[in-house]
Structures are given as C-alpha cells and as structure tokens.
Amino acid sequence: MNKLVIQGGRPLSGTLTASGSKNTSLPIIAATLLHGGGTFTLHRIPNLQDIDTFRQLLHHLGAESSLENNTLTISTANVNSILAPYELVKKMRASIYVLGPLLARFGHARVSLPGGCAFGPRPIDLHLMVMEKLGATITIETGFIDAVAKEGKLRGAHIHFPISSVGATGNALMAAVLAEGTTTLTNAAAEPEIETLCNFLIAMGATIRGVGTTELEIEGTSSLHAVTFNNVFDRIEAGTLLAAAAITGGDITLLEANPRHMKSVLKKFAEAGCTIETTPDSITLKSPETLLPVDVTAKPYPSFPTDMQAQWIALMTQANGTSRITDKVYHERFNHIPELNRLGAGIEIHKNQAIVHGIRKLSGGPVMSTDLRASACLVLAGLVAEGTTEVLRVYHLDRGYENIEMKLRTLGASIERQKYQEF
C-alpha cells in the first residue's frame, strides 16, 4: 500500500490549474452509452482510479476507450451487454449511473447493487423510483437490480424527488432523453455536475429546459449523436487546495476555475478572514494573519457542499475560537474526527454536528484514511502539524484527487508517497 509522508509547517503559495471534475466525468461517461455510433471525445477528464474503474465497466459492456493527456475517447458502437457485474460495481457506487442509459437504449438493464449498504445512509431507492415512474418493472434478486421497460420503451412521466439527489437526478435525465414523450423533474438536484450533464445531453441532441434549476423538462428523442465536449473544473479539488493555502497561511491562485460554482465556499473563506479575488475563470485566496471561526451547514447546492465538510473541519482547528460544522446530507460523515483528535485537535461530535475548538497546535503522527474526503482532511492537518505526519491508505485519496502530492509540492509542501506493508 501507499502512504503520504508530510513534513508540516510550510506556508503553501503559488498558482495551479484546476483539474477536471471527477463527479461530472462519471455521468457524462455513462451518458455515452445512450448512443451506438460515432466516437465521443471528452476533454479535461482527470486520470483517477474511479475513472479507470468506470472505463473497465464500459469495456465489459462492449465499449472501447482510451485516455491520454486528460482526453478520453469512447466508442459505444459495439456495446452488446446489459449486465454490470458485481466485481466492477462493488468498487464504486457511481456505477449505478449505467442503469438509466442501458435501460433507455436497450429496454433492459441488469446492474449489481453497489457495494456496502443498498438502502442505508446512501440509498439507491430514488434511482429505482425514477425507473419505475418511467415505466420500468424493477425486481431485485441475487444482489442484482433487474429493470425491464414495458414493451421495450420508457415513457415520459412527472417525477418529484422527496429529497434532492444528484445521482438519481442524473439517472433520470439520461433515461428520460430516450423516453417517449415529456418528462418533468421537480426538486431535482441543481449542482454544477447536473448542469454540465444537461449541457452534454443537449450537445448530443436532447431537448432539456430549466437547466441550472430544480425543475427540469425533458423532451424524449430517438436521435442522439456523438460529440466532442469540454468537462468543467473540479470544485471540490479547488476548495481543498484553497483550504491547503489557508490552513498554512499561504496564498494561491487557481486557473480555469469558475467562481460561480463555488459561491458558498468562497463566502465562508471570506468570513474566515481570507481575501478572495475572482475573475470569470480564476480564484485567488490570500490568507489572514489569524483565521476566524466560521460555522457551516452542509446541504445540497447552492449551499455549502458535504464534500467540503471534512476539509473545513481541518481548517477550523486553526481558527481562533469555536466553530460548528453541521452535515444535513450525511449525518454520520465524521470518521476523520478521531484521527484529527489524535493529532491534537479538540473536536466534539453531537449527532450530525462537529464542534471544533481552535486554535489547536497539531503534532504530526500516523493517521488512517477511511474515505476520500477524510483523506483530504488528514492531508490538510499534516500540512500544518508540527513534525511528520503519515497518512495511510491513500488509495482513498487517489479515487478523487489527481496528482495531489505533485500539486502540493508545487505550492511548497514537503510531501512524498512511500510504500508500506500493512499487517
């Protein structure tokens, strides 16, 4: 296994270009399954483990792809399978994104239930509700979702989401573009990732109204085509890099980053005392002498994102006072807190709220990653901790951050990847 070894205490400053968004890449890659001819060319696709896993899934279905210099080419002309097997789906919950496209194109899809909990804190029931509303019959047996469209064709419908769901909204969009008639989605997710998926589907020939809002209207079509498309930047990676500069007292400029997609996060950095300067495609952060404590509540977009919650907790350990971080999306997403406290943080957990007492002087030590954003949080802590911090199990980090140690070194961090044996 790999670990990151960090010598803390160095201010990080410099200029970086933001990577393409992983959370946008996955649904637009899935959407290529909707069309069976031509070649898709997708620019600004990050070279990540999750992208590789998704490509393996497409290859299993019969697609061909290549990724070079962040440009992904995909041909789905030879897709001849409707089966997404457990061996691939278990690696990544986002594999559920193939359900809608396969069902819409072939009238039948058989997709393994994602690994972990099928109906727990991150349920798939909304995805199944969407397909049933569009006229599919759903059965679950032997660990697989078996979805069959009546008479081989989905039908447009009105779908109201009881709670906002990016994944279910994405699957609804992809299924609806090939359905007969009109589909309306209310209380749909409005995240930039959904906006970008809409723009990709429109480029393919779909008709979608209300893009960027929580009410979407999709006119079904039978004619889509392959396209060349530019992916958007990764707003969570960008927020993490801004936090890396802020927690170490440095300054950073991110290029090819749209501040419109980060209003809630940039507002909180400003409240913490950081100076924020933006252009239409860049963000600059200058750190204050002392960070101020700032409460945040993670909720669906346009509110503060749950995927920045862990990083904000790390940042607030260095703020002069007490802050409260509440997560209303995933109530138990606090696995990083015991590890932060091992480094000297003072954090209490009360239900879905973390109370962070700053300023705390962190001391380096070994810490264990438990998930993607927890890994980023621990790296941030290591950057400011005194001495050496070892972040173990960084395969979690590799799922969502492209060349993270190289980028941090560019800013002045002392960080290197080493192999270790886990017993």
Curated annotation (Swiss-Prot):
EC number: 2.5.1.7
InterPro entries associated with the record: Enolpyruvate_Tfrase_dom (IPR001986), Enolpyruvate_Tfrase_sf (IPR036968), MurA_subfamily (IPR050068), RNA3'P_cycl/enolpyr_Trfase_a/b (IPR013792), UDP_GlcNAc_COvinyl_MurA (IPR005750)
Compartments, as annotated in UniProt: Cytoplasm
Reaction(s) catalysed by this chain's protein: phosphoenolpyruvate + UDP-N-acetyl-alpha-D-glucosamine = UDP-N-acetyl-3-O-(1-carboxyvinyl)-alpha-D-glucosamine + phosphate
Binding site for UDP-N-acetyl-alpha-D-glucosamine: R93, R122, P123, I124, D125, L126, D307, V329
Catalytic center residues: C117 (proton donor)
GO CC terms, sorted: cytoplasm
Chain positions recorded as phosphoenolpyruvate binding sites: K22, N23
Protein's job: Cell wall formation. Adds enolpyruvyl to UDP-N-acetylglucosamine.
Name used for this protein in its record: UDP-N-acetylglucosamine 1-carboxyvinyltransferase
Species annotation: Chlorobium chlorochromatii (strain CaD3)
Gene name per UniProt: murA
